[in-house]
From Swiss-Prot:
Residues 114-151 are annotated as: Disordered. One of its GO terms (biological process) is DNA-templated transcription. Keywords: DNA-binding, Nucleus, Transcription, Transcription regulation. It comes from Penicillium rubens (strain ATCC 28089 / DSM 1075 / NRRL 1951 / Wisconsin 54-1255) (Penicillium chrysogenum). One of its GO terms (cellular component) is nucleus. Disruption phenotype: Has low impact on expression of the sorbicillin biosynthesis gene cluster but, except for very low levels of dihydrosorbicillinol, impairs the production of sorbicillinoids. The gene is sorR2. This is Sorbicillinoid biosynthetic cluster transcription factor 2. It comes from the Eukaryota.
Length: 684
C-alpha cells in the first residue's frame, strides 16, 4: 500500500470516530505522543470490529496491537525490540524474505515515541549499574536470529562495541546461584571508590569560617616534611624553594597577604596538608579521613570557579588543580575529578608549558624548567585520570626528550626522560585503539584487513617500542635491582615508573585478552590445528596475564608492614592490586592461562589486599567481591560479607557468561576496548 493510500485509509477509518477525537484532551492540546497513542487505540477498536466481519487490516496495525507485548519479550531476551521506533525504520529498508515488496509507512505517525528501544551499542544504564540478580538474568540473552547476519561477526566482535557486551550462555549454572547475594560493590579504585571516605564539598559561594586558618607550626612542619618525602617524589608538581619561602612568610606574617593570589596559595597549602595526612597509614581511619577532608574542604572553598575559568592562568592555579585532582581521585566525585584534570591541562597549554622553546615569552630558565616539569606532571595526570575513569585522554604533543645517554643525564632528568618516552608510547597505543573503533577507520580499511588484524599489526610495532624502552633503562633502574637502591625516594620513583610501564603493557594487550575470552571454547574443530591468528591471540592474552603477575610482584615488594608510611602511597597500591586481580579472574576461565604460577600470584594479591583492610572500608568490599567472583568460576564455596560460606558455584565450563562474571566489578571488556565515545573500562 502506498503512502498516499495509507493516509486516505487512515482518514476514512477514523472519520467515524471524529467526535471522540474532538473530545480527547491530548489531541486538542497538541501532545504528539498522547495523540499518537490515541490514534492507535482507535485503530485497535476498528481492528476488533473488522475481525468480527472477517475483514483484514493492513499488517502494520497488527504490529501496533502487539507492540507492548513484543517489547516485553524482547526486553526479557535482552534484544532490541523489533517493534521499536528505530527497528521499524530498519525494517522498511530491508525486505523480508519471500515478499516482493514491503509496506513503507510513515513511522512517526504510527509508532508513538513513548520510549526508545534498547540500543545495541550501549546497554541501558539501569542494567549496567546494578549487579545481576537470580531472577533477572535470562537463560540466554544473545541469540542471533538474523539469517543475514554478517559472516565475520564473531571475528570482529571483540573489537566493535556496536554488538554490545559480550554474550554467553548462563544455562543451568545461574539457577545454582539462587542463594547468592549479588555484589553491591561496583566501585573501582581511582575511579569512584571512596578510599578517603565520604567527602562532602561545600558550595564555593559559602565560605568556611576556618578556611584561612592554619594548624600549629610544629604540626604543620611535620605534615610538610611528610609531603616532600613521601608524596612529591611520586609525582612532582611544586617548586620546593618557592613553596618553602611562601610557607615561612605565611607563619611569620599570617595577617598580611603574601601576594595577590594569597587565597590560591592557601588552597595549595591545605591540599598539601590533606595529602600528607592521608599518607600516614597508622593513624585511625576515621581520624585520618576527618582531618584530611577538613583540609581539602578549606582548599575547595578558597578556589572559586571564577578564578579558574575567567581569570588569566598561572602556574600556581595549574598546580592547585593538579593537587586537588589527586585527592579527588580517591573520592566518589568522578565529575569533579575529570573536570579539574581537564582544566589543569588546558590552562597549562594556554601558558605554552608544552613547548620546549618559547622565544616570545619572557622568563628565567628556572621558570621554563618549572613549566616543563608541570607539563610532564599534567600529561601523567591526564593519562592516569583518563585510563582509570575510562575516558579518552588528550592526545597532546609531548616534547621529545634530548637524545642523551644515561651517563650524561642526572637522576631527575633520567626519570623525566623515561617518563616522557613512556607517555608518548601510551599516546600511540591509545591512538591505535581509537582509530580501530571508529566507523571512519573501518571505511578506509583494506578489504582483506579486519579490525582485529589491523590492531594486531599496530600492537606488534608498539610492543617493540615498549621493549626498546625497557632495554634503554640503566642496569640500576632494572626491577631486579630496585631493592638495592638506598635512597627511599629514588626507590619509590623507580617502582612507580615500572608499574606504569607494566600498566602500558596491560593496556596494549587487553584487547587481545578480551577477544580471546569472547571466543567460545568449541569454536576450533578438534581435527584442525589452531591457526596462526588464534595462536597469536592466545600468546597476547598470556603476555597480558604475565604483565599482571609482574604488577602484583612489584606491589608486594613495596609492602613494609613495620613502617608507619609505606614506600608507595597506599591508594596506588590498592589501585594496581585491583588491576592485577581483575586479570587473574579472567585467567581462571582458561586452564592454559591460570597456571600454578598465576594461582600463586592471585593468592599474593588477596593477601596484599587483606593487609590494606585497615586503610579503607572499600578494601573489605573489594576482597569479598573478588572472592565471590573466583568462587563462581572455580566452584568453591563463595564467602558472605559476615565471613561465612554460602552454596557452591559451578565452574566456567558449564556455560557461565564471562561478562556476567565481570559486571559485578564494573568491568566491561567490550566497552573498554573500542567504545563509541569513551573506553568504559572501570579498572584501568
Amino acid at each position: 500500500m502506498e503512502n498516499g493510500c495509507t493516509s486516505h485509509w487512515l482518514l476514512s477509518r477514523i472519520a467515524g470516530s471524529e467526535s471522540r477525537l474532538a473530545n480527547n484532551r491530548a489531541f486538542r492540546c497538541g501532545s504528539i505522543e498522547k495523540a499518537a497513542s490515541y490514534l492507535i487505540g482507535e485503530l485497535l477498536i476498528i481492528n476488533q470490529a473488522e475481525a468480527k466481519s472477517n475483514k483484514r487490516l493492513p499488517k502494520f496495525v497488527h504490529k501496533a496491537d502487539t507492540y507492548h507485548k513484543a517489547c516485553a519479550r524482547c526486553k526479557a531476551r535482552g534484544k532490541t525490540c523489533a517493534y521499536g521506533q528505530g527497528a521499524v525504520e530498519k525494517q522498511t529498508v530491508h525486505k523480508p524474505r519471500g515478499q516482493a515488496s514491503s509496506v513503507h509507512m510513515p513511522v512517526p505517525m504510527l509508532v508513538p515515541p513513548i520510549s526508545s528501544a534498547p540500543s545495541l551499542e550501549t546497554p541501558p544504564e539501569s542494567v549496567a549499574a546494578s549487579p545481576p540478580t537470580v531472577d533477572s538474568i535470562p537463560v540466554s540473552h544473545h541469540v542471533n536470529e538474523d539469517p543475514e547476519a554478517e559472516p565475520d561477526l564473531e571475528k570482529n566482535r571483540a573489537y566493535y562495541t556496536a554488538h554490545g557486551r559480550f554474550a554467553g550462555q548462563v544455562a543451568a549454572a545461574i539457577n545454582e546461584r539462587a542463594g547468592l547475594i549479588p555484589a553491591t560493590c561496583n566501585q573501582v579504585p581511582l575511579v569512584d571508590a571512596p578510599l578517603f571516605g565520604d567527602l562532602n564539598l561545600p558550595s564555593q559561594s559559602c565560605a568556611l569560617s576556618s578556611s584561612t586558618e592554619l594548624p600549629p607550626r610544629a604540626y604543620a612542619d611535620q605534615l610538610i616534611d611528610i609531603y616532600w618525602q613521601h608524596v612529591d617524589p611520586m609525582e612532582p608538581v611544586l617548586d620546593r624553594q618557592r613553596f618553602l619561602e611562601n610557607y615561612e612568610k605565611a607563619y611569620s606574617t599570617p595577617i598580611t597577604p603574601l601576594c595577590a593570589d594569597y587565597d590560591l596559595w592557601l588552597g595549595i597549602l591545605n591540599v598539601v596538608f590533606a595529602l600528607a595526612v592521608q599518607r600516614q597509614e597508622l593513624n585511625p581511619l576515621h581520624q585520618r579521613n576527618e582531618e584530611a577532608n577538613r583540609f581539602f574542604q578549606r582548599a575547595w572553598v578558597l578556589l572559586p570557579a571564577e578564578s579558574m575559568l575567567w581569570k588569566p592562568g598561572s602556574l600556581e592555579l595549574v598546580q592547585c588543580l593538579m593537587l586537588m585532582n589527586r585527592y579527588l581521585h580517591c573520592t566518589n566525585n568522578q565529575q569533579k575529578t575529570w573536570t579539574t584534570a581537564g582544566l589543569a591541562m588546558r590552562i597549562a597549554q594556554s601558558m605554552c608549558c608544552h613547548l620546549t622553546e618559547t622565544p616570545l615569552l619572557k622568563g628565567s630558565s628556572d621558570d621554563k624548567a618549572l613549566k616543563q616539569k608541570v607539563w610532564a606532571s599534567c600529561v601523567a595526570l591526564d593519562r592516569c585520570i583518563s585510563w582509570s575513569l575510562g575516558k579518552t585522554s588528550a592526545l597532546v604533543l609531548i616534547p621529545s626528550p634530548p637524545p642523551s645517554s644515561p651517563q650524561q643525564l642526572g637522576e631527575n632528568a633520567m626519570h623525566d626522560t623515561l617518563g616522557l618516552r613512556l607517555h608518548e608510547i601510551g599516546n600511540q597505543i591509545q591512538l591505535a585503539q581509537i582509530q580501530n573503533r571508529t566507523s571512519l577507520a573501518a571505511r578506509f580499511r583494506p578489504p582483506l584487513l579486519s579490525q582485529q588484524d589491523e590492531y594486531h599489526n599496530a600492537a606488534l610495532q608498539l610492543d617493540a617500542c615498549l621493549q626498546d624502552w625497557e632495554n634503554s633503562i640503566p642496569s640500576d633502574w632494572q626491577p631486579r635491582n630496585l631493592r638495592m637502591v638506598t635512597d627511599r625516594s629514588s626507590r619509590a620513583e623507580r617502582y612507580l615508573l615500572h608499574l606504569r610501564y607494566l600498566h602500558h603493557r596491560i593496556f596494549l594487550y587487553r584487547p587481545m585478552l578480551a577477544r580471546f575470552y569472547a571466543m567460545k571454547p568449541d569454536t576450533q574443530p578438534l581435527h584442525k590445528s589452531p591457526s596462526l591468528s588464534h595462536r597469536l591471540l592466545r600468546e597476547s592474552a598470556s603476555m597480558c596475564i604475565e604483565a599482571a603477575q609482574q604488577v602484583a610482584s612489584l606491589v608486594n615488594e613495596t609492602l613494609e608492614p613495620d613502617e608507619p608510611i609505606g614506600l608507595l602511597p597506599w591508594w596506588y597500591r590498592i589501585y594496581y592490586l585491583h588491576i592485577a586481580g581483575a586479570n587473574f579472574l579472567a585467567a581462571m576461565f582458561r586452564s592454559e592461562l591460570f597456571t600454578d604460577s598465576v594461582s600463586q600470584s592471585w593468592e599474593s594479591v588477596m593477601l596484599a589486599l587483606r593487609a590494606h583492610e585497615h586503610l579503607s572500608p572499600y578494601v573489605q568490599q573489594c576482597l569479598w567481591t573478588f572472592e565471590t567472583l573466583a568462587a563462581r568460576i572455580t566452584g568453591k564455596p563463595y564467602p558472605s560479607m559476615d565471613g561465612g560460606g554460602c552454596g557452591l558455584m559451578v565452574d566456567g565450563s558449564s556455560g557461565v557468561s564471562f561478562d556476567d562474571i565481570f559486571k559485578d566489578i564494573n568491568f566491561d571488556f567490550d566497552n573498554f576496548i573500542f567504545g563509541p565515545e569513551d573506553f568504559g573500562e572501570g579498572l584501568v
